[in-house]
Amino acid sequence: MEQTEFKEYIHDNLALVLPKLKENDDLVKNKKMLANGLVFYYLYFSEMTDENKVSEAIKTLIKDEETLTLDQVKKRLDQLDARPVETAKKTIESILNGNCAVFINGLDKAYILTTGKKKTRSLTEPTTEKVVRGPKVAFVEDIDTNLALIRQRTSHPKLITKKIMIGENKLKPAAIMYIEGKAKKSVIKEVKARLKNIQLEDIQDSGTLEELIEDNKYSPFPQIQNTERPDKVSSALFNGRVAILVDSSPFVLLVPVSLGILMQSPDDYYERWISASLIRSLRFASIFITLFLSSIYITLVSFHQGLLPTALAVTISANRENVPFPPIFEALLMEVTIELLREAGLRLPNPLGQTIGLVGGVVIGQAAVEANLVSSILVIVVSVIALASFTVPQYGMGLSFRVLRFISMFSAAILGLYGIILFMLVVYTHLTRQTSFGSPYFSPNGFFSLKNTDDSIIRLPIKNKPKEVNNPNEPKTDSTET
């Protein structure tokens, strides 16, 4: 876009702007010639702009037109909080965001009137992060509303909001929020740098932004947390993390993040610590079940039958007597079926989707057993895995475990128990090397240390919660950093 500065001649200035906006039917171009010789020209998109606001502003500007002078126009522009811009690029950005640009002959600037028409849905309950107890408000697609929701919940005098335009043409409104003195200065600097370096023009949602700014694009694990809950963002800010908001997205990004943080749920702190600790422990157990239960079944049936108790080995052998497929194919058949049912349930309307998932799973499982395509033991195994995968509170993390489960199954089918151990070592090594905005993603020493168990696998009473950062994998903040 043009970086040329405006001049005092209105036609020259319009020649810099109008060609860039092309011939749009919803682009309103109005010209007013006053009796005293002043010429006003204003541009806006009708569908994005409140035309009543534009009309009132123009009436205020041209009042008493017979005696109106440029000095009086400037004073009235100040009264209307019109923002002067000196280049065509900034003017076009403002028009595309729903504002009205006013050009006046004799002035070497365009003046931007804030007349955008906000179209957003009302506040609703979270759909992907439901809790039994806690706030029932979720973010919406309007960035200003989301900023207000966060500030309303985060009553801190040092809460800082920085707005920024991102994308190849710097047209997408975004913002970062952090609490000065709690967030690490290096993390804030890195967030700003990565946002400014984005060269993609089409950013429709924070999910696109997440992929553009994460540390390792080839890792199966999410390195940025996303949430639709204002209370979750507020808690993260108090713990020294940085929030990233994008206009038109109801999900806020939080950095840095760790494996422990991704396994936490907001209602962990709204319930009694004993029950919350038990549920959190079950979540970590569900990781093992999701990743390795199918693999263990394949290993024991294919290679290590001797590790099973005799009665169980006989039962499994009897169940598989008429199954014509090897264990790996049998397991893949059921796992793929479950994934298809899960995907179908997500895409269909809620009542119908739930019915498809429940009825489809029961009917297909029963039919597969009766047709001797799979064993009944495997149906139980796959059902337990499906339930375990739903306990992961972060949807993106759950997807990662589901993908890795298939790799684990192939490892078990090829190398047996050694394949599972090798796969575990590879995942462990990857996690310990992974970072999130320079902070460790998984630190075994800190994660399993008794000193830090107050907010990792278990949650002790809130009075024992550290004042600075409530997760052992989360970076500590020096008091001297801002």
Swiss-Prot record:
Q: Which domain of life is it from?
A: Bacteria
Q: How does it sit in the membrane?
A: Multi-pass membrane protein
Q: List the disulfide bonds.
A: none
Q: Which InterPro entries match?
A: Spore_Ger, UPF0353/GerABKA_families
Looking at the keywords, is Cell membrane present? Answer: yes
The cellular location(s) given in this protein's UniProt record come to:
Cell membrane
Q: Name one GO cellular component term.
A: plasma membrane
Q: Pfam families from the xrefs?
A: GerA (PF03323)
**Where does the chain cross the membrane?**
242-262, 284-304, 321-341, 351-371, 373-393, 406-426
Q: Which UniProt keywords apply?
A: Cell membrane, Germination, Membrane, Transmembrane, Transmembrane helix
Which terms does the UniProt entry file under GO BP? spore germination
Q: Main localisation, per the record?
A: membrane
Which family is this sequence assigned to?
Answer: Belongs to the GerABKA family.
Job of this protein: Forms a complex at the inner spore membrane which acts as a receptor for L-alanine, thus is involved in the stimulation of germination in response to alanine. Can stimulate germination in the absence of GerD and GerK gene products (fructose and glucose receptors, respectively), but the response is improved in their presence.
Q: What is this protein called?
A: Spore germination protein A1
Query: Origin organism of this chain?
Result: Bacillus subtilis (strain 168)
Taxonomic placement:
Bacteria, Bacillati, Bacillota, Bacilli, Bacillales
